[in-house]
Amino acid sequence: MNDLETRLRNAIRAVPDFPKPGILFRDITPVMEQPLLSLAVVEGFRDAMQTIPVDAIAGIESRGFLYGMPLALRLGVPFITV
């Protein structure tokens, strides 16, 4: 496990039975409350995509918008909201 993965595991909250019984919701709000960790997430995505040709980044709903736009800027490609 690398440092970023450890930091994410420590930050992401597990909320059992939300929004209904039997669902384990993973709340990433604590990640977004830590600017350096959020930046590390975007940089980690960017690093993982260095060898993949990318035409655009599509962000799906609210959380996808929050991380998709900075990633698109880092990669120098358009951002598409879905």
List PLM regions with ranges.
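PRPP-associated nucleotide enzymes
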Residues: 1-82
